[in-house]
Amino acid sequence: MTRIGFMSDLHLDSNQFGEAERMQLLQVLQEEQIDHLHLAGDISNNFKQMSLPFIQELQTQLPVSFNLGNHDMLYLSEEEIHQYDFQVQTFGDSHLVSLAGWYDYSFVPEKSKEVHLRTKNTFWFDRRLERPLDDPTITQEVLSQLDQVLASLDGRIIVALHFVPHKDFLVSHPYFQKFNAFLGSQAFHDLFVKHGVRDVIFGHLHHRHSSRVIDGIHYHMRPLGYIREWQLTEDFFKSFPQYKISQMYRLHKRYNAVKGLPEFHQYKRQHLANEFRQALTILDC
């Protein structure tokens, strides 16, 4: 039996991952008896110069696989993106299919494609990517290939992807609802139902959810996310209320107010292992 650990959204550069963080992560993986680690996208903003060296360092300690997220695609050609898509690994009678996924705006159907493009090109990270096709077309091509891959497999199927495959995980806050268009597509869930997929691990949206079953599919969403969003950052202000700011809902501002404090660095060292555990999904295959 192989014990697989899944994580997503490490964002190495934004979270200033160094040797201490890497060693702490390895310690957690060892304590949890992880035999194989899979990273489900958004490892960093520079795949070749940061993500790959990080993965190669981890691979000296245990097998590591990955799929891309949108942040990983920066500076990659479309050919390189395709190279890392649709990897299939077999563990006993279980198959792990990994892919990036994409989005088609269908989570916000009331707005036109033109409106979505204006929003994307004004606010969204993916405006920096140079993909040759439009988003709905990319998604249709990904779905078509995924359909073929899933149809070829027998036994237990596990899918790891980056983007959101079901509307139940969308953002409900009115300001952020327009960005749901760039999170994924319900069409992925429909394919998972069609092919009897057992487990799906994903990230992209930096909210951690308890595992839940929808139409027989076990969904797991526990992204690490940005340090300003971490539980330990939230808890720091409970332990040190004297550092609270007036606009605590402004995650950037509250983190910037404490990131240089010795107390925060010590608190992070004490609680980082637990943060990693909260962002780890474990499946036995």
Pin down the residues of each PLM region.
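Conserved beta-sheet core of the metallophosphoesterase superfamily
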Residues: 56-58, 65, 92-95, 166-251
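Short amphipathic alpha-helices and their capping/turn segments at secondary-structure boundaries
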Residues: 29, 79-93, 97, 142-155
